[in-house]
Regions:
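Exposed extracellular interaction/assembly regions and N-terminal maturation sites
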Residues: 26-119, 147-171
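Extracellular disulfide-bonded cysteine-rich modules/repeats
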Residues: 11-14, 140-148
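Small/polar residue-rich beta-strand/coil "junction" motifs that cap repeat-based extracellular fibers
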Residues: 1-30
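A general structural signal for short secondary-structure junctions and capping/turn motifs
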Residues: 4-6, 16, 67, 134-137, ...
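Glycine-centered small-residue hotspots that permit tight backbone geometry or close packing
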Residues: 1-4, 47-49, 141
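Structured beta-strand segments within beta-sheet-rich domains
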Residues: 116-142
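A residue-level signal for beta-strand positions that form part of recognition/binding surfaces
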Residues: 12, 22, 49, 143, ...
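Residues that act as N-cap/strand-start positions at coil-to-secondary-structure junctions
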Residues: 9, 54-56, 140
């Protein structure tokens, strides 16, 4: 019988088999990476939480997904310090082929917490999310998750906190 848990020669830990229907993994946690300065694609580790923690803003560039090696990998972003200059930004490496699809819920924090949708459709061709700390979101408490679901295609979900006349965070 195949081993239920093993470490392969490529340093991949395998838990269960293709017929496993349930697995408990105790003590599993995600790394939290400070995004207090720009983070290049090579330093954007998958299944991590990036903490936008600098009022000067920062940019995290997601790795190129064109070769299929990113499929199934997710990147999460939480704003703990509102950007007051520049912006908190999430960008795709290949802005010619890669695209964001999905939806960000916007909560307008200065007008009875009105909620609106900020959809990203495939035809929109969005390649970055720009949170300016006010109208485009990125106020402390904003959350975004980006998951590569296919070659050159990233699914976005989250809730961003905005103020003023809210505008799309997608570019």
């Amino acid at each position: 019988a195949a081993a239920a848990s093993a470490v392969g020669v490529d340093n991949t830990t395998v838990i269960g088999t293709t017929t496993t229907t349930s697995a408990l993994v105790h003590g599993l946690k995600q790394p939290v990476i400070a995004a207090s300065a720009n983070v290049a694609a090579a330093a954007a580790f998958p299944n991590s939480i990036f903490n936008f923690s600098d009022a000067d803003g920062a940019s995290v560039t997601l790795p190129d997904s064109g070769d299929g090696s990113q499929i199934g990998k997710s990147y999460e972003f939480i704003t703990t310090v509102t950007a007051t200059s520049n912006a908190h930004q999430i960008s795709l490496t290949d802005d010619s082929n890669e695209k964001f699809i999905g939806n960000l819920m916007r909560i307008d924090t200065d007008s009875s917490d009105a909620i609106s949708a900020d959809p990203a459709l495939i035809g929109d061709g969005f390649v970055e999310i720009l949170m300016n700390g006010s109208t485009q979101g990125g106020i402390k408490g904003s959350y975004i998750k980006c998951t590569n679901i296919a070659v050159d295609l990233w699914f976005v979900e989250g809730t961003i906190l905005c103020s003023g006349t809210v505008a799309s965070a997608f570019n």
